[in-house]
Amino acid sequence: MTTLTITRPDDWHLHLRDGDVLTDTVRDSGRYNGRALIMPNLVPPVTTTEQALSYRERIQAENKSDSFAPLMSLYLTEKTTSEEIRKAKATGHIVAAKLYPAGATTNSDSGVSDIKKVYPILKTMQEEGMLLLIHGEVTTHDVDIFDREKTFLDTVLAPIVNDFPELKIVLEHITTKDAADFVKNAGPNVAATITAHHLLFNRNHMLVGGIKPHFYCLPILKRNTHQQALVEAATSGNPKFFLGTDSAPHAKDKKEAACGCAGSYTAHASIELYAEVFENEGKLENLEAFASFNGPDFYNLPRNTDTITLVKEAWIAPETMAFGNDFVVPIRAGEAVEWLVK
């Protein structure tokens, strides 16, 4: 039987939601992750230090794992102050601020419409060593949804990188060859997370033979040439790329609807799904760096010191999983996952 022991991984982009669903989402992500960076797009958004610390307390109240710890982020708005950034940084629990272009994804209506309005805040973040996380899509109606990421790179991200050369930036959940190339060619302060579902699937999986709503996420799945570029980047050993699931649960009826929500749930099997990708590429030896080393190294945090063991043993993912009083349909529902964490 094939086994693989790696340093305990971290998830550098995770949605846990809030309220009664935390019992389920914290359990799923806390099974084998050491840390997870929790996204702040609640309703209302997590815009202050007090809100972030309160959210952290609610997560910890449901955390049954001695090895799992949430790291928090602030939701960046045009009203965010430099004082708030400094206060957040001083807590030791809030490690980043998240830039959502207004309307780009779930609960992003409070996001930034004019990037220049937050330049003073980016300057403070650069000075304080607070990381900037970016949902890299434009949201103007004249840009096709499949082109939003590429346009963002050219019109928004490139100027930010140029104007703030010391600001550490993570381009979240990249979906295009353009984004992978941008990160590779940028300086050492620019990195990216990549999801398991963007490595395993492309837009054909979502659209051919009937619409599959559980593959619908933002940024949207792209064509297979972009998928292959992401796989190459993730499995290459390049330290600029690391694991961020963007596991984003919605209740089954909110996905299977005339106007369904964006987000795919992978927390039930995240490292197992990544292992499939790396095995398929013959690069299992690079999984540990992607999952366990590159993220903490970029964040200037210590690597985890304990390990987990994966076994090449197929199991069937559940058709549905508990999500508070509702159910969530996970990726690979009712289908085989090739690896299992022992």
UniProtKB/Swiss-Prot annotation:
- Where N6-carboxylysine occurs along the chain? K98
Q: Does the keyword Metal-binding apply?
A: yes
Q: What is its EC number?
A: 3.5.2.3
Pathway this chain belongs to: Pyrimidine metabolism; UMP biosynthesis via de novo pathway; (S)-dihydroorotate from bicarbonate: step 3/3
Q: Superkingdom, according to UniProt?
A: Bacteria
Q: What Gene Ontology terms for biological process does this UniProt record contain?
A: 'de novo' pyrimidine nucleobase biosynthetic process; 'de novo' UMP biosynthetic process
Give the catalytic activity.
Answer: (S)-dihydroorotate + H2O = N-carbamoyl-L-aspartate + H(+)
Residues that bind substrate:
H15, L16, R17, N41, H135, L218, H250, A262
- Per its UniProt record, what CDD domains does this chain match? DHOase
Q: Which UniProt keywords apply?
A: Hydrolase, Metal-binding, Pyrimidine biosynthesis, Zinc
Co-factor requirement: Zn(2+)
- Entry's InterPro entries? Amidohydro-rel, DHOdimr, Dihydroorotase_CS, Metal_Hydrolase
Q: Name one GO cellular component term.
A: cytosol
Q: Pfam families of this UniProt entry?
A: Amidohydro_1 (PF01979)
Catalytic residues (positions)? D246
Cofactor remark: Binds 2 Zn(2+) ions per subunit.
**Family of the protein in this entry:** Belongs to the metallo-dependent hydrolases superfamily. DHOase family. Class II DHOase subfamily.
Protein name per its UniProtKB record = Dihydroorotase
Question: Source species, please?
Answer: Aliivibrio fischeri (strain MJ11) (Vibrio fischeri)
Query: What gene does the UniProt entry assign to this protein?
Result: pyrC
